[in-house]
Amino acid sequence: MIRRAGVVLRDAGRELRGRDLSLWAAGVTFFAVLAVVPLALVALRGAAFLGSPEFVRHGVSRWADALPDPHGPGPALSALTTAALGTPWTALLVTLLPATFYGEGLLRGLVQVAGQPAGALVGWRGRLMFVPVLVLSPTLAIAPLATADTVAGLYTRGGWPTFWGITLSFHIDWLIIASVTAIVFAGSAPRGVRRGPLVAGAFAVAAVLAGFFHGFLLFLAIPLDWSVPFGGLVVVGAVSALILWLYLLHVLLLLGYRLTLSAERTQLGAGGIDAEASKTPTRSPASGQVH
């Protein structure tokens, strides 16, 4: 197992050597910033349709009350919920297009990590790939809203109840993120790569992302003034902190995708890499012949 892990890590390192993963993650983050609010509007409005507006308001309010105080996002969540429930359906349909931009950004980044040519239609392919996520988003939003009373109650009690609340919310977030990651990984599979291992890898990557999400909640509890580097502009500081978190999240996502591809590529162990390398033509320095 340890030897296999070493083979996967070395293969991923070779594929990423000399390539700008940070730039790719920044590109994905740009598209995410365009899409995250429209996506949240669709998810919350759909959850209200499946449940009720009061169900959504109550769930969001309970989560807002349970989050750390120093940078509590309660007002922002309340405004987002009001917009989601009050926007006419005709106007809400307009948000579907920018919501799919996330899929375009993800596919562009994943294609680069896989070392594949993007192609002229990569943007539309990514948006179409993300449509199932949009369709599922109301259902995925119901899970944290339905468990808000339980989890928020555990969060605020301290001690072991808080631990169990974090454990419960981690698994809820993991299943939600895993569903999205599996769709994205399967939809972006390079030619010749089986989708089954990519979906399995998506669940492992989702566990890391869910843990990172909970780390961000811990970051919210640190009483730092985010506005200091921006001349005291509170909104700018908060938005910049969120964008930085999204950027780091996408770095982890792209790394996880590369490791998943390398795990599939090296499934036969180091011998699989040697066999693949033996197929690569080599030129004899003496004769100049290709062997």
Language-model-detected regions and their locations in the chain:
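Membrane-embedded alpha-helices and immediately adjacent juxtamembrane helical segments
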Residues: 1-291
